[in-house]
Amino acid sequence: MKQLHTFAVCAYKESPYLEECIRSLLFQTVSSNIIIATSTPNDYISSIAEKYDLPLIVNPGESGITQDWNFAYTHTDSKYVTIAHQDDIYDAEYLETALKKLEGARRPLIFFSDYYEIRENEKTYSNRLLRIKRLMLLPIRLPMAEQSRWIRRRILSFGSPICCPSVTFAKANLPYAVFQHGFRACEDWQAWEMISKLKGDFLYSPRALMGHRIHEGSETSAIIEDHGRTEEEYIMYRKFWPDKIARMLNRAYSTAQGSNHLE
């Protein structure tokens, strides 16, 4: 029998937060499949998979953010899948809330929720970046807005307020792989832009149901340090705007990159 939902945990090297992430998935109020996917197999990841009796699948191909996420996504045999990032945690009612929204929709594409940040093990529910993202998402809370391609594309035309690890995908209504190879920083924004053009629902919960960890060792912080994000953001803006407006928005949006630093 096909499973309803799978958490696919993408593990990389030896994250000290991996076990905390997995425990948050095990403590969900409704049960789910959980698998661990990695392109960097090691004894540390194997020991955690063995400790919690979880399947461990190894990507034998090219390693990278989009490659690893697509590998995890395509190696799940369930109606819905959440790609869980190893550094993040999920509140106990995340999956229950997601499934209620997804199962109640006529043609779901993705579910996503609000989130909080974890900085030095402290939960931060409000800062400038979080407030901006919540403001950007206000239109999708309007009646019938979740079905509107026009509304979600207008939201995405100003940036990506959707937190990637908060997303659950309805696989039957989506392409085989959702992340485009070649993107390293805006791979999630690219995916939402692609999905936003499809017929179906963007389902949103304004409850902060998961925690996204901010730390200097994260891949996002590394990308910001080498300025790899700005070029990709310009590419994304050009999907919605002419060149001059795209460059103007890109300059304004790039100031938010500092929110991924601990200082």
PLM feature spans:
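Conserved donor NDP-sugar-binding/catalytic core segment of glycosyltransferases
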Residues: E93-K133
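A conserved acidic beta->alpha catalytic loop
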Residues: A37-S46, G61
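Short aromatic/hydrophobic "clamp" motif used to bind/position activated sugar donors
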Residues: V81
